[in-house]
Amino acid sequence: MSITPAKKSELISEYKVKDGDTGSAYVQCAILSERIRNLTEHLKVHKKDFHCRRGLMVLVCKRRKGLQYVRNKYGNDAYLDLVKRLGIRDVFH
């Protein structure tokens, strides 16, 4: 359900804004998206894992707030580019 350090460093290198960047909103949204994908796959098998389902909802809300921050801080074009790169739906339009 959690992501491996190798996958996390791969996501960081793919979504970083500059060298040494590990905590920008882009990277955080990418890591949250990967965790959401993993939990979604888990819930397809374990349908009655309600504790996990609540954790998934918390992660989705965190990602939504991060995406909202990107949209407000960097503009709509940067937000739409990030949504497209992550392969998720646009939640604000």
From Swiss-Prot:
Part of the 30S ribosomal subunit. Forms a bridge to the 50S subunit in the 70S ribosome, contacting the 23S rRNA. The lineage of its organism: Bacteria, Pseudomonadati, Pseudomonadota, Alphaproteobacteria, Rickettsiales. InterPro entries: Ribosomal_uS15, Ribosomal_uS15_bac-type, uS15_NS1_RNA-bd_sf. HAMAP family: Ribosomal_uS15_B. GO terms for biological process: translation. SUPFAM superfamilies: S15/NS1 RNA-binding domain (SSF47060). Keywords: Ribonucleoprotein, Ribosomal protein, RNA-binding, rRNA-binding. GO terms for cellular component: cytosolic small ribosomal subunit. It comes from the Bacteria. One of the primary rRNA binding proteins, it binds directly to 16S rRNA where it helps nucleate assembly of the platform of the 30S subunit by binding and bridging several RNA helices of the 16S rRNA. This is Small ribosomal subunit protein uS15. It comes from Anaplasma marginale (strain Florida). Gene3D superfamilies: S15/NS1, RNA-binding.
